[in-house]
Amino acid sequence: MILNFIHYKRRSIPIKLYLQKLAHLENLSFVESYDLMECIAENDLTPAQLGSLITSFYHKGPSGEELAAFASLLISKAKHFEIQDSKRIDIVGTGGSARKTFNVSTTTALLLASMGLKVAKHGNRGITSKSGSADLLTNLGININMDMQTCLFAPNIHNALKHVQGVRKELGFKSFFNLLGPLSNPLRPTHQLIGVFSKDYTELLANALKILGVERAMVVHGLD
């Protein structure tokens, strides 16, 4: 399914129809979702349309297929480079747990890398959590703005959603965008471990990872 979209050309989308479907709690198809995210990435929606879209998904809840389509589009627009390792793992969290814990995913990634595993850690600064991966690395004295072969700092790789930040901040609630970071690693990890802020999203993200073609994955949520 994903490979079919490599040379896919977007059509003009009926945004009002999509908003009506979401208002009636109907899921969008993979194609509709892919087209919609491309419209968002190309800044083709008005702030009112974007705000309505985010709010509609907040009430409906995204499907695994919708998330996989969104992530596929973002990966297609991200900066890339060739990688030789046939197996690689990403360990990442969604953030947003409000527990103010240390950055578990990054410390785990460093531990696994020291054991010889090929880790492709994709991360950002903390937005809804106290310490994102980039915050931790910066405090360790690591330059996060190195070339992407050395550091997969999300803002240096994904430029498609910079204009969305203002609307997200004005709305002030978690949205499907909080779930896209862990799914949008441009190196397409073969194995993945994702921590989520709510147990309600474990199966949802697992389904999205399956659609995206990840070979083995675990989506976890702590009970503490």
Regions found by a protein language model. Name each.
Residues I54, F102-M148:
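A glycine-rich phosphate/pyrophosphate-binding beta-strand-loop-alpha-helix module
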Residues G95-A98, R125, A134, L183, ...:
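Gly/Ser/Thr-rich beta-alpha loop segments that engage phosphate groups in nucleotides
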Residues L17-K21, N27-L28, S76-F81, T101, ...:
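Glycine-rich anion-binding loops and their surrounding alpha/beta cores
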